[in-house]
Amino acid sequence: PTALEADEGGLRVGLLPRQFGDLHELQGGEHCTRTVWFGFDRDAAALRQRLTGYHDPLSATCEPSVYSHSQAIPYLPAGDGGYRDELRVILQEALEGDRSFFSKREAIDEYGWRNYGDMWADHEEAYCPDERRPVISHYNNQYDLLYGMLIQFLLTGDRRWWQLADPLARHVIDIDLYHTERDKAAYNGGLFWHTAHYHD
């Protein structure tokens, strides 16, 4: 929740609260999914442990080679994909260092209800004067980064790929999918391409 209020009369949880200084805009076809957990346990240590399980749940995975040998995902290579060294460097930079996806999320403080999980399209600053940076724009999964992250997770077993893919998937499901049957058939249920490029 983004707001909590408590008094003698009860507890109020704000998911899109009025205390926010602006509007919460949901465009046609968008969803906003929230989960709220209540724990009324007087044992603070037990409650903390239970919440840890919610925030970082156990997940069962296989050795990366099992996925490729199963052929459940067509053309999934075995091992590390046989990548050239140049590609390995790019993939490593996606996870570590100042230009990693994690660092970019921190740089623009991308933790809001609408865009958390989406990736900053920082390449759109290319023609922008320094005084107008950062230009906040998003990929909206237009190049299927989600698929790439999930494939890297399966190939490497590196949980950081999952830590990026999971919130991106949740963002795509709520914001980037056009949840309607009232538009043209070609658009209904498809991806909502709503990025304006190269301007702030």
What are these regions (language model features)?
Residues 1-200:
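Catalytic cores of extracellular degradative/oxidative enzymes
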